[in-house]
Structures are given as structure tokens and as C-alpha cells.
């Protein structure tokens, strides 16, 4: 691959160069808000200050892909995001919800993240960056990363157009992952050279750690367990609204048949003798998990958004991962790989039909 090494302090000039040289028309980039982190959409390069202190911050609020969902205009936007966010953006391209030619995906390494409120409350202890050793030490003090991050096996910046890899101590390796990425780096004023970025051993370690954490998660493995798991759900649909790959223009559960009220509710009770309320609680989640079964990137935004603190990571990512394994599909890995449900083969999945 082609790339270069920059000091952390040089990253500000790099991001400003993307705007100044018209590589992108706007940039979605993290910013510091008090002790926490949020995103901003930048048009004026002078609004970017000290990005090195925040782009690797182990904090997760909203999935950046959700910000650019529906970006189907000619103006080009760059996104500085974690791997799960980039992967969600790639799935949106496949779903025709994001124009591939109008987005530049800049992915940063991620060791794992804390819910934004946890990060802000413990910023003094967590700081601007973490590694696996620090995460383990903080967990011993009761400050734990999100379950979605603990079971994630795609933490390195190896998807998207440009990688910002923390692979060399005080330096950041800035490398193009696609021809578009190479062209963007050159246009931004960087001089590229051949870079060897072998992270196989690191990926193996991450995969082993993620599997161990996944195996340790409490299981929702029966109808009774699922009913108990979803007992407190108020069907607010927050999990749908923050999901980067849930995009239906008209949701069934916003329609009268999917969200009955008044007389319709009474008629259902009359027909069945009794109904659980809120209605369609189980059907809502089963429908959603089917809809995102191949495109879920396990970012955990659904769990973060739940007002009842239901640990949805134990449901959505766990179930969708099983479907993805059946199809041998990794969402967001390759923008050219077709979505499993959009392809057909005469002989496929025979082992699942036996």
C-alpha cells in the first residue's frame, strides 16, 4: 500500500488540507465537547483544532454512518470514523443510501470504546487514547468498555479509503486502502511511499479476545428467555432510529396495523381475549433483526439508545453474526461484495436445509 507517517500534531494539517485542496467539500470529524466527544460537519477548515486529541478517543455516541445516511448529492463528504462506522457506511453504499463517489471513508484504529456518558464521567482516568492493557486496568476499577466493543473483532483501520493506523509509537501511519484513497492523500499534499503494514498477529489477538468475550456473554437462548429479556421494552423505536443500516422510509411499526391504538387495540383484545401491551413488542424486534441480519456491523448503537437499558448487544449482534457466518459474509468488508439477499445460486445453503 501507499502511505506516509505523520506525527499526531501533523494530523490537523492533513485534515485541513483535505478541505483546502477541495478533496472533500465537508468533513464529518469528532470534536471535544467538555469532557465528552461528539461529531461535527465541517466546511471551514479553521474550525478544525487539535483533532489528534479526539479522533482516537475511546468514546461512542452516534454512529457516524447515520449522519451521512441519505447523502446522495454531488458534494463530497469525508468521514473520520471508527471501523464499525466505516463498515456501516459501506453497507449503506450497497443499500443505495449513500453515494460511493460522494464519500471518502477515513478509518481510525479503535481499541474499544466507552459509552459517551461513561467516557465523559471518567475522562480523567481514561484520557485521549487507550490500549488493551489500559482497558483491562480500567475494567478492574469498574470502568468497562461497551459490550459491543468487547466482542468486536474488527478494530483495526483496514476498511474504507484511508487508514489512520497507530502502528508506530508516536507516529500515525496514513495509508491509502483504495485508489480513491491514494488519490485523496496525494491531492491533500502528502508524499506517498510504499508502506508495509503487517498486522496479522494483532488481528489474531483481537479475534481471540473478542471470541472469549462473546462466549462469556449471557445467552438469550429460548422463547421464555427472550420474552424475559424484552420485558421492559416500551417499543420507543430508539434502537431503530439510531441504527445506521435501518433505513426504511415508511416503517411497518409506524403504521396503524403495526402500531394499533384506540379501537384497533380494543378489537385485537376482543379477537384474542387478551393482548400484551405495548403491542407487537416481540414482533418488532424479530422483524428488525431480520431486516439487519446481514448488514448489522455490531456497533452497539441500539443498546446505547435504549432508555430501559436493555443489553441489546446480546440480541442483535449475536443473532446477526450467526446469519452472516452462514452466508460467509462480513458486512462492510468489501464495497464490491453483493449483499447476500440480493444474489441467488441454484445450489446454496444446502446444509441449512437438511
What are the language-model segments listed below?
Residues 1-226:
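Iron-sulfur-associated redox domains of electron-transfer enzymes in respiratory
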Residues 4-11, 236, 299, 312:
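Generic structural signal for well-ordered, non-membrane alpha-helical segments
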Residues 12-13, 227, 237, 290:
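Residue-level marker for well-ordered alpha-helical positions
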Residues 82-87, 143-156, 231-252, 293-309:
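Local cysteine-cluster metal-coordination motifs and their immediate loop/turn environment
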Residues 93-96, 233, 322:
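Alpha-helix boundary/capping residues
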Residues 114, 235-238, 325:
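Alpha-helical scaffold segments in carbohydrate-active enzymes
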Residues 207-231, 248-354:
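Ferredoxin-type iron-sulfur electron-transfer modules in oxidoreductases and energy-metabolism complexes
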Amino acid at each position: 500500500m501507499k502511505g506516509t507517517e505523520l506525527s499526531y500534531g501533523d494530523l490537523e494539517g492533513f485534515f485541513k488540507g483535505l478541505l483546502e485542496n477541495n478533496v472533500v467539500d465537508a468533513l464529518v470529524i469528532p470534536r471535544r465537547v467538555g469532557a465528552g466527544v461528539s461529531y461535527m460537519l465541517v466546511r471551514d477548515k479553521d474550525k478544525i483544532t487539535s483533532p489528534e486529541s479526539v479522533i482516537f478517543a475511546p468514546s461512542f455516541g452516534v454512529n457516524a454512518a447515520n449522519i451521512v445516511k441519505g447523502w446522495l448529492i454531488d458534494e463530497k463528504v469525508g468521514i473520520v470514523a471508527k471501523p464499525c462506522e466505516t463498515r456501516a457506511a459501506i453497507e449503506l453504499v450497497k443499500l443505495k443510501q449513500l453515494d460511493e463517489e460522494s464519500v471518502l471513508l477515513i478509518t481510525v484504529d479503535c481499541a474499544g470504546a466507552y459509552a459517551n456518558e461513561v467516557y465523559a464521567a471518567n475522562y480523567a482516568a481514561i484520557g485521549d487514547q487507550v490500549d488493551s492493557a489500559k482497558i483491562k486496568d480500567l475494567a478492574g476499577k469498574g470502568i468497562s468498555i461497551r459490550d459491543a466493543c468487547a466482542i468486536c473483532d474488527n478494530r483495526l483501520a483496514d476498511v474504507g479509503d484511508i487508514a489512520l493506523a497507530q502502528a508506530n509509537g508516536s507516529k500515525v501511519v496514513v495509508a491509502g486502502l483504495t485508489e480513491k484513497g491514494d488519490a485523496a492523500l496525494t491531492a491533500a499534499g502528502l508524499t506517498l511511499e510504499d508502506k508495509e503494514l503487517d498486522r496479522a498477529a494483532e488481528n489474531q489477538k483481537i479475534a481471540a479476545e473478542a471470541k472469549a468475550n462473546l462466549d462469556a456473554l449471557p445467552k438469550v437462548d429460548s422463547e421464555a428467555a427472550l420474552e424475559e429479556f424484552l420485558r421492559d421494552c416500551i417499543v420507543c423505536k430508539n434502537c431503530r432510529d439510531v441504527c445506521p443500516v435501518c433505513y426504511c422510509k415508511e416503517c411497518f411499526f409506524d403504521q396503524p396495523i403495526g402500531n394499533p391504538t384506540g379501537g384497533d387495540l380494543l378489537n385485537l383484545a376482543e379477537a384474542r381475549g387478551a393482548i400484551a401491551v405495548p403491542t407487537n413488542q416481540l414482533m418488532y424486534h424479530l422483524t428488525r433483526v431480520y431486516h439487519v441480519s446481514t448488514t448489522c456491523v455490531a456497533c452497539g448503537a441500539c443498546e446505547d439508545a435504549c432508555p430501559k437499558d436493555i443489553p441489546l448487544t446480546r440480541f442483535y449482534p449475536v443473532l446477526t453474526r450467526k446469519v452472516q457466518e452462514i452466508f460467509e459474509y462480513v458486512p462492510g468488508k468489501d464495497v464490491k461484495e453483493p449483499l447476500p439477499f440480493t444474489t441467488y445460486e441454484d445450489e446454496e445453503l444446502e446444509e441449512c436445509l437438511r
